[in-house]
């Protein structure tokens, strides 16, 4: 239809991330108004103009969890069978053909039942050890995709469109579920000052730009301070970022 942008999604599961700029507490009514105009509906209802009533959700304690913690707490049988189930609903890409042929040897693939005979010894302890080791390996593997922007570091291509870079994909999924491609957004990070000392809230810093970072028309850049846990830092002036619109 006119005025509608078509986006093809190759899987049955998808998600949408939307950012709305908030310029302070007095700006909340504007944000609420924008949120009130957001709707998710079948295309047929949009075209017909009929009023669409979305199905009401329900709370389930079973689904009340932090996704990454849930995955990391799974035993190997649960993990691989859940992957097999999800691959039925979300078909692997054509580029995954070679990998699928390899892992099919232990019954990992769409609709399969994981071959538990490959699990030997102390399964729980071996799985726990492997998870620890593989996370360290993923971090190491991810470094080859790290790029420099002055003193800042960011993860570069093929982030957001990983193709067969499975380790890179897993690292991003572990740390943040998903990521934009570099054409859409960059997330440079810095942890040391100009002298190589670790940044700390006990000191004051000056961030100097020769010129503002270039962005496309309508874009923006911001500077945000995060703690060691990668969450925002509570502070007495209630300041969480500096935002510049272009």
What annotation goes with each model-predicted range?
Residues 1-244:
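A compositional/structural signature for long, glycine/proline-rich flexible linkers
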